[in-house]
Amino acid sequence: MSNPNPNIKGRIHSFESFALVDGPGVRCAVFLYGCALRCKFCHNPDTWCPSSISQTKEMTARELFDKAIRYKPYWKNNGGITVSGGEPLVQLDFVTEFFRLMKKEGVHTCVDTAGQPFRRDPEWLDRFNELMSLTDLFMLDLKQFDSKLHVELTGKDNANILDMARYLSDNGKEMWIRHVLVPGVTDDENDLRKMSDFKIGRAHV
């Protein structure tokens, strides 16, 4: 386990204090900058990267915690905090420190990710495992199952994304697999069947 560093800084795009579709219950949703995917239907393309340094809002993990924890009374027993983006795993260490503070307060934590940064080299995986230990729920967005279709849609292969789903399942983490169904874009019947078969084979989904 790494030494706690609540002063680590993250690049924050926006903050939603009363989110109802970003995990179970009432939640605070934090949207971070940074994403390598270029999804044709992206809902938040402005989170890919700031167009100028002046648009980047930096906060320490402690500052973000202090801002979010004020809303804890609204979360009750089934709400909590969700970190989304962009792609939160781009700022993995920052999310880890933010969640470390949240877990000390007994807050339910969720990462909303497309999984693209996932890899199994030992250094990165050690850092990811630490985040995983502090995360109650992963919401994994599968854009397409077929690799060729995924490249056409996002500009990137999905081998590491599917590998992340397997890794989370093998480690017993709670995971929601989500898919955006866009008519004529992500509704290929064969691809949906493959995705369904993949989900059925994954425990804790």
Model-derived regions: residue spans:
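N-terminal [4Fe-4S]-dependent radical SAM core
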Residues: M1-E58, R70-N77
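A structural motif detector for beta-strand N-caps
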Residues: C39, A203-V205
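Conserved AdoMet/S-adenosylmethionine-binding subsite of the radical SAM
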Residues: F65, I69-P73, N77-G80, G85, ...
